[in-house]
Amino acid sequence: MAPAPTSVPLVSQPNVISDLKTALAVQGSASDHPRTLHQLLSQAAERYPLQQLGFISSSAHDSSIQTKSYSTFNQHVRNLARALTDWKKPVGSIVVVYLTEHEDNMAAVWACLLAGYIPCLQPALSAQQSHKEGHINHIKNLFLSATWLTNEIGAEQVMSVDGIDIHLFSDLKLAAEGYNVPADWAAVEAKPDDEAILFLTSGSTGFSKAVVHTHRTIIASCYAKGQSYGLTSETNVLNWVGFDHVAGSLEMHITPLLFGSYQLHVHASTILSDPLSFLRLIDDKSINIAFAPNFLLAKLARDLEKRSELYGAFDLSSVKRINSGGEAVVSKTAKIFVTVLKALAKDPSKVSFVVSAGFGMTETCAGCIYDPIDLSVINPMHEFLDLGRPIQGCEMRIVDPEDGITLRPDGESGELQVRGPMVFARYYNNPQATSSSFVEGRWYRTGDIGIIEKGVMRLSGRIKDTVIVHGVSYGIPELETYLQLVEGVTHSFLAAAPYRAPGQETEGFVVFYSPTFDLNEEDASNKLAATHRALRDISVKMITLPPQQIIPIPIDQMEKTTLGKLSRARLLTLFKQGELAKHIARADELLSEARGATFVVPATITETAFAKIFAGVFNLSTDDISAADNFFELGGTSIDVIRLKREGETVFGLPEIPIIQILKHPVLRDLAKYIDALVSKDNTQQEYDPIVPLQLTGNKTPIFFVHPGVGEVLIFVNLAKYFQNERPFYAFRARGFEPGQPFFSKMDEMVSSYAAAMKRTQPKGPYAIAGYSYGGVIAFEVAKRLEAGGDEVKFVGLINIPPHIADRMHEIDWTGGMLNLSYFLGLVSKQDADDLAPTLRPLTRKEQLDVVWKLSPPERLVELQLTPEKLDHWVDIAGSLIECGKDYNPSGSVAVADVFYAIPLRGSKSDWLNNQLKPWSGFSRTEPAFTDVPGRHYTLMDFDHVPQFQKIFRSRLEARGV
């Protein structure tokens, strides 16, 4: 007989009982507890005046920490609040806070609260103009007002929408300098059930909803969480989640503020660009509690597992708890992570911490269910870590998802529902959504499918239409809308469903569709291959991930509901149960047939050897590799190029296979021919050709990219793959890398060479060209040259480069050029490059290179296959390009220009845009488009930023009709 179904209340967690008692003793009696956020801030400043808030901003290249004491911060935000009241807005007015840095967001939110306003935290706006403007208008209509507090860059993004009342945070700070209010000043006295902070949902299934959290819901959540964590004034907390997320603001700021803990808030770019900094900060600041989602656990485990030279390098004895959320945590990954951290520790015996997977939502003030376990002694029972038991005051239950009421027995899956004082009050100005989110008893319907066994919860799926990739939620309906447009897909007979294969680190998805053609007709194999290729390409471009499986199902076997919809849940169930195996087998048969039509069996010894290398890189069978395969079309990245180079050198006993030759010979048989010639010494000096074809598929206008000031093109490899089956992607490489090649001595010579090569490659226009950094002015000059010859240039992309560069070129001496190159290559940090310059200048050239060489990470030198001699020569190439730019004075104009801007090397982004980049307007016959892109000058195309950059860049190509 099945046990009686019950809801699950709070269950005490034995491993935190002692810390809980300490926390409660520190906080005092219940009568001392603050009832509003105003009281909470006052209490923190009074009880812990010297405790610190630390911040590492996005522009802190050296990861330097700026600090404010609780007392100083309290005074700062109250002065800001007093300045805010000068806006003369009614009490209860909503202010959309749209800022980048933790410190600014934090101060703005508290200032709004103390001024009697309601802050609404706005995450990063979409790069798609129509989607961004649609969202801003939606927010304006939802709040019946449109007051935004932002910075200069945010104002640029928002001002395209009419009727927005924009205030700059810099102006507010300036105004606040004129006030010095009492330490307990507030414009209004808040009540526990007043609206406190609004958080926007992801909008993954439509426009965002605004989640209303009151003072009561926030404080209830923070108390329960702090007690669960065992927080005290001796605890050190590390946060890198954005402040616009409930985890960043409520869980990792207000919660430790309540308990008087030290807080270090780090901009996400610092951790994501260098995951090792996560461990350095734990070591340097004796961090006790930190957050690491599954993808970061996986990345750290994968990157550091083989880094034996780092073993024993970090003091990790302080860390006691690593929270993880946002996506399911793979048990195996978490175990490896713990093992690796112990190996990296100076004294592994002193490292003892729990990894706590958790469940939470915007609607629950972030985490409300946790399962802290010591993975060094406990082996998880399931593929993913359990999510555990509720915090104090929270209840959970599993019910029938159809009626939302009928309880499911212990161990049986169903819809997860939660309730408690930390659950949100309502959706702002949306009673219908609020009503549909709750059932009788104020149980909140999470939309997740879970199982509770012996009081411990784990998730098994989701009702909601989203797929999570590395913690980022993407809307399935939006993806389906674009996939429906693919030729070969029957309209309204396509569905995509989130799916995580056994052992997979992150979530993926499966596409089900009915083809417009009969799978038994004569040309079905080629049609199917083309359809699947298009479905993969669109998926990668929209959500950075291809489908795990694409399943064609005849239309007469694709059942719809009575409302005419496909059931994703039903299709996914059929897939998991093997009911679609015959359709998968038929598709595989046809795709193999299509591939067989173009399959070329590797014939020579060299081709066979490369087939083995290709197979190893892409985890394929050697029999599946064709001599006609293109390395990049198989999915090769810039890192894969390095691996191919190394393995090729080992197999063929060659001292070096130049990377450029791999880029120029990406097809297996062509690369084999080149190697045969190299081995036989029959590799005669080839005439310099600046064009490097990085991808050749697609029928749209080709795009040509000009190298940055280092002269190389490897940085474009990861970008080029996003253009597969859309348009060819060519890159220009500077002269001088190959033996015997002279450097360019004049810019005009370079422009003439590139323009001629462009015409040879694409004899007729219209043309599209872009240049990154220094390459931007070259692209501008090449476009002018083409237009002067009567050709149409429909796109000129100028990426983070001003028109006037001569002064900057004259500033760069040999030492500066060498350090710039070293920073660009990841050999030294930006701070090291700046600090070393005066020290190195008196030294000889060789001595300077020796210093940089010793500072360079050994693994990076191996990855780049650098030697001191190669680095020295590369510095000369970069120096020759600098010399070409010293006399450059822009003149003339092009028909159109698109300027892309990121965080500059020096100064603020707004100054960079307004004073350095806006002058491009004088060199375009139509007003240029200025487009903000994520990242810094040297990182905007790196692995972390290229998925967003390609979307933005391709949208501008589309806008220009290219």
From Swiss-Prot:
Tell me a GO biological process for this protein.
biosynthetic process
UniProt key word Transferase: yes
Give the keywords, sorted. Answer: Phosphopantetheine, Phosphoprotein, Transferase
Kindly report, in one word, the top-level EC class recorded for this enzyme. transferase
What InterPro entries does the database record attribute to this sequence? AB_hydrolase_fold, ACP-like_sf, AMP-bd_C_sf, AMP-binding_CS, AMP-dep_synth/lig_dom, ANL_N_sf, ATP-dep_AMP-bd_enzyme, PKS_PP-bd
So what family is this one in? Belongs to the ATP-dependent AMP-binding enzyme family.
In its UniProt entry, what is this protein called? Atromentin synthetase nps3
Which species does this protein come from? Answer: Serpula lacrymans var. lacrymans (strain S7.9)
